[in-house]
Amino acid sequence: MAQPYSARSRAIEPFHVMALLARANELQAEGHDVIHLEIGEPDFTTAEPIIRAGQAALTAGKTRYTAARGIPELREAISGFYQSRYGLNIDPRRILITPGGSGALLLASALLVDPGKHWLLADPGYPCNRHFLRLVEGAAQLVPVGPDVRYQLTPDLVERHWDHASVGALVASPANPTGTILTREELAGLSTAIKARHGHLVVDEIYHGLTYGTDAASVLEVDDSAFVLNSFSKYFGMTGWRLGWLVAPDAAVSELEKLAQNLYISAPSMAQYAALACFEPDTLLILEERRAEFGRRRDFLLPALRELGFNIAVEPEGAFYLYADISQFGGDAFAFCRHFLETEHVAFTPGLDFGRYQASHHVRFAYTQNLPRLQEAVERIARGLKSWQG
């Protein structure tokens, strides 16, 4: 009899939404019109200037490995982006290009977390964060958060939940699934609380750029020793290119470079050269138009769902999600999602994918469809509520 697969693998939970997505695909194959509000991927394709840059890179033979830290031109372009957007002078040496934001999270986890140690994470939160910690034999200390703290960690929560095994905290701003943002003052407070305990602060800034009304502050504005995870997937619309970056303190760069060399050698070369076009004025104009469109979608869907009775206690300031309490409708979140998929062919995500705290009566809607599709989705949801028996 073969040896069993690792306990590590068994401990990493699958996405509940994937079962719903598989069923949605079956329904589509049967000819049903499914409205997808479950997957966190922009519906826009990659902007044309980026595509052209990628095509030019392929034609020019830019298909070989690059340095593990990424091509110098891209690290310099990102450094310039921090200067223009945040007024920050970030040495390009501190920027490592990674295979998606996931690559940045993997590097930070491998560098900072020893076996048996943990980071504090908000619950609800992005599920892969805790799974990456398990992958490096660490753990996530999930901290229940609700609307009273806008679903974010606070210095008081850090003080209450920090223990002998804590080595840091990972926060997200804007956050998935709630869309809430940490202010500059809140980031500074978290930094102070974690430094007082000799820990590391890691901030997921993957949804920076996708904010509505107030720009998100970077933690690097208040803490130059923080680790920042970012990605070309969301604001820049390059999900399938698999490209991200990590900003780290200068003292950590050599260790991170060694890890990168061993874990993935380099990020995809053609994607790196394509990403140089992300920072061109014509591209940024397209991206800002898309941001405005996401804002219009949020401004439609938020009041529409509230009018139907969904309790969305905190208005999202960024990303493209609404996190809704469905307890007033009764029943379990997964069954609720399944009902609307089967009866109305609208797919959204059960809260179980984002943690444990009150997860069974929360769902997440992604406004990654155009306004006519969102309007149709709301009509279907209104109809489906009449037949729901929680």
Protein language model features and the residues they cover:
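Intrinsically disordered, tyrosine-centered linear signaling motifs in cytosolic regions
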Residues: 64-65, 207
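Short beta-strand to alpha-helix junction loop
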Residues: 69-70
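Substrate/cofactor-recognition hotspot
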Residues: 9
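PLP-dependent class I/II
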Residues: 2-5, 15, 20-23, 27-34, ...
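Glycine-rich loop-to-alpha-helix module at the N-terminal edge of alpha/beta enzyme cores
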Residues: 60-64, 77-85
